């Protein structure tokens, strides 16, 4: 049974304008928006990315969609740091919850999360579906 559904869309340029140029690893590692949104594991990928603005926009959209699926949004016991986005060996996106996000998922009776991320020239979008057993 579906216990949560969230979607988000982000204008990539809005995020990319706040991100230093690719290749400037020192500046990227200090990027305030990235430090707020990304976990340590995500930050390592961001710093090495050839398109850091696009990478951050996609992660931002995914985490906002997840927070909406949890029914809280960001800031009501759930932070960006409580949600981690990674990829499996085939490149499919995976989502993991810690802290307040994991607590909220448990409260909803959720046991599985499905994530889809898409991007085009100007926009990144994500949808999260939470399921119970």
Swiss-Prot record:
Its cofactor is Mg(2+). Its EC number is 2.7.8.7. InterPro entries: 4-PPantetheinyl_Trfase_dom, 4-PPantetheinyl_Trfase_dom_sf, ACPS, Ppantetheine-prot_Trfase_dom. It catalyses: apo-[ACP] + CoA = holo-[ACP] + adenosine 3',5'-bisphosphate + H(+). It is found in: Cytoplasm. Keywords: Cytoplasm, Fatty acid biosynthesis, Fatty acid metabolism, Lipid biosynthesis, Lipid metabolism, Magnesium, Metal-binding, Transferase. GO terms for cellular component: cytoplasm. One of its GO terms (molecular function) is magnesium ion binding. The keyword Lyase does not apply. Mg(2+) binds at residues 8, 64. One of its GO terms (biological process) is fatty acid biosynthetic process. It comes from the Bacteria. NCBIfam families: acpS (TIGR00516), pantethn_trn (TIGR00556). Transfers the 4'-phosphopantetheine moiety from coenzyme A to a Ser of acyl-carrier-protein. Belongs to the P-Pant transferase superfamily. AcpS family. This is Holo-[acyl-carrier-protein] synthase. It comes from Shewanella loihica (strain ATCC BAA-1088 / PV-4).
């Amino acid at each position: 049974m579906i216990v949560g559904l969230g979607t988000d869309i982000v204008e990539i340029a809005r995020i990319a304008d706040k991100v230093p140029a690719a290749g400037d690893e020192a500046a990227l590692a200090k990027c305030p928006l990235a430090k707020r949104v990304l976990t340590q594991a995500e930050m390592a990928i961001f710093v090495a990315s050839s398109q850091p603005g696009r990478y951050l926009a996609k992660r931002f959209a995914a985490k906002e969609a997840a927070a909406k699926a949890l029914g809280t949004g960001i800031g009501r016991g759930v932070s960006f740091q409580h949600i981690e986005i990674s990829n499996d060996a085939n490149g499919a996106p995976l989502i993991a919850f810690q802290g307040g996000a994991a607590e909220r998922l448990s409260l909803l009776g959720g046991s599985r999360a499905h994530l889809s991320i898409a991007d085009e020239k100007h926009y990144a979008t994500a949808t999260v579906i939470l399921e119970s057993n």
